[in-house]
């Protein structure tokens, strides 16, 4: 980790007031902590755009496991991409609906491809990919 450097930021007073309210709402003890998180989030967003860069994330899907061979198709797709699936969690929401969470890590293009294949599978009711960083380039 590098040394900490102080720098000044000039803001419109209305913008600063809104930023301070955001800091309070999110329980930041200092503006610096909030600004660091904003910078990190922007850098992580930039990482996601690099399809070769390794990223991590979770994919959550909801589906009716009674739909004809849907569970089998989802399993086959996952086996086709086993190298980027770290682990998975399967939850029975009710008699028909299942929630599955996959923890993914790999090249951005591969993570997106797997996610789109699963989300677009006929019978999947909802899917959401939530990306983050591996943290290697952040301090």
From Swiss-Prot:
Cofactor comment text: Binds 1 nickel ion per subunit.
Residues engaged in binding Ni(2+): 79, 90, 92, 98
SUPFAM superfamilies, sorted: ACT-like, Ribbon-helix-helix
UniProt KW keywords: DNA-binding, Metal-binding, Nickel, Transcription, Transcription regulation
Matching InterPro entries: Acetolactate_synth/TF_NikR_C, ACT-like_dom_sf, Arc_rbn_hlx_hlx, CopG, CopG/NikR_regulator, Ni_resp_reg_NikR, Ribbon_hlx_hlx, TF_NikR_Ni-bd_C
Pfam families with a match to the protein in the record: NikR_C, RHH_1
GO MF term set: DNA binding; DNA-binding transcription factor activity; nickel cation binding
CDD domains recorded: RHH_NikR_HicB-like
Recorded superkingdom: Bacteria
Family of the protein in this entry: Belongs to the transcriptional regulatory CopG/NikR family.
Protein function: Transcriptional regulator.
Protein name: Putative nickel-responsive regulator
Source organism per UniProt: Nitratidesulfovibrio vulgaris (strain DSM 19637 / Miyazaki F)
């Amino acid at each position: 980790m590098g040394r900490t450097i102080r720098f000044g930021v000039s803001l419109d007073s209305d913008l600063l007031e809104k930023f301070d309210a955001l800091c309070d709402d999110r329980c930041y003890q200092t503006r610096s902590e909030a600004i660091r998180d904003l910078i990190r989030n922007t850098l992580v967003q930039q990482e996601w755009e690099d399809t070769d860069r390794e990223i991590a994330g979770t994919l959550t899907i909801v589906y009716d496991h009674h739909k004809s061979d849907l569970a089998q198709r989802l399993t086959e797709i996952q086996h086709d991409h086993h190298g980027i699936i770290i682990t998975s969690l399967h939850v029975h929401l009710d008699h028909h609906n299942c929630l599955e969470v996959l923890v993914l890590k790999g090249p951005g293009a591969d993570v997106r491809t797997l996610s789109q294949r699963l989300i677009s599978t006929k019978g999947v009711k909802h899917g959401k990919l939530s990306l983050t960083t591996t943290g290697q380039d952040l301090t």
